[in-house]
């Protein structure tokens, strides 16, 4: 049967088309190999161009060519089917084997016969955790997480102490060498010592990095196995003592770390809250907050000082697998790493506590790098194809050079997302790429940073993120050029743009109530903060308050 099919599939036939040009009768003969792999319309266009055929036969030629291909293909299929039936009747093909092959193919391609996919370990663990965190066992879970947090904190504290001692010792050595410079030592000796110091620091940092990585991996495995076991044991009504196994362990070392500055001290926050209404026909109500705070305050682990030891993150844990997620926007440069600036500070906070649900921040960034590399490769190949096809111009040349220069980086306005379960008040971080242009005072509503905010809000609507924190001035730190008029113009622009985006959200998600938090740097003055607070009700329609008085 396969031999017959191969013979039919490789058959060549001649397409003949006759037409008149004036008094001349012309004939077009084209050999075609069946089955014809090329689209009939494309083949027709090639024939018209290759043979310089007159335009008045274009439509008739296309119809004749299409009809010829359809008729000959159908004829081949009929002959192939007849040969297959003949092979079955003659016993050349095993009927039972053929039926089994058909049944298997049908079952694999038909949904109702397909085997249901088995739930993955991550899905099972997520369901179990969601059940437990909404049960009386939630306190037990948080106590266990806190004990793991204390363990990692002590490890980080030991690392910092050892690194500090190394730097102090190296500083003393370098100071002695500098005193002998020009006497018994040369610049080469200084450079050699500096290289040794750098190598020693790298070795020590790598040692502690590997130890932290190993400790968090062990904690994650132990925690997940313990959660599954706890869920199974709680189904047994006779086992009521398991929840008493986990007790909060105090950390004396943590107190010493606090003494040397490991605990972040919060500056006094300023905060204003507003309830607003958007829309004329479909009115939606949202909550707005204006805060003077560090963006990372929503990530750093805090203690509930009244109870003494428990992490202040119960609400974050309760909503981890819910439709009410919390996110924040970090302004980063175009390099996907955690080596400098707020990216390094954010990664440091992420490392303070093991993430029991998602990959480590380093692993997530590696995945983002691979995705960006693939996307850039695809865009570059498409752009190259368009240039090779003759559509190149000066603008496209500039785009090509720009794409090559930023081949492994994200562009301004683009963002990548990381997921977290180990931060204080957020689940999702949007890393929005901005450049130095945001520090100028002449950006518009079409600026990449503003459009990036729009796309972030759209992702919030489609992925159940109901609380989002945004840097109002599109900067995390103030500088000299950011005067009061600069701040007022920037805040007005962001307020108005976010208002428009929130009105768009009503059509995206049906008008779900959301909370948007606008953050300004901690170095901003109280006077400036209250000027921004007074601006907000002028742009958004704030709900009026109703004062009730009692009659005597």
UniProtKB/Swiss-Prot annotation:
It comes from the Eukaryota. The keyword Cytoplasm applies. It is found in: Cytoplasm; Early endosome. Keywords: Cytoplasm, Disease variant, Endosome, Intellectual disability. GO terms for cellular component: cytoplasm; early endosome; protein-containing complex. Residues 383-403 are annotated as: Disordered. InterPro entries: Fy-3. The keyword Thylakoid does not apply. Signal peptide: none annotated. GO terms for biological process: regulation of mast cell degranulation. Disulfide bonds: none annotated. It is linked to Intellectual developmental disorder, autosomal recessive 66: A disorder characterized by significantly below average general intellectual functioning associated with impairments in adaptive behavior and manifested during the developmental period. MRT66 patients have intellectual disability, delayed speech development, neuropsychiatric symptoms, and relatively normal life span. Component of the FERRY complex (Five-subunit Endosomal Rab5 and RNA/ribosome intermediary). The FERRY complex directly interacts with mRNAs and RAB5A, and functions as a RAB5A effector involved in the localization and the distribution of specific mRNAs most likely by mediating their endosomal transport. The complex recruits mRNAs and ribosomes to early endosomes through direct mRNA-interaction. Plays a role in mast cell degranulation. Component of the FERRY complex composed of five subunits, TBCK, PPP1R21, FERRY3, CRYZL1 and GATD1 with a ratio of 1:2:1:2:4, respectively. This is Ferry endosomal RAB5 effector complex subunit 3.
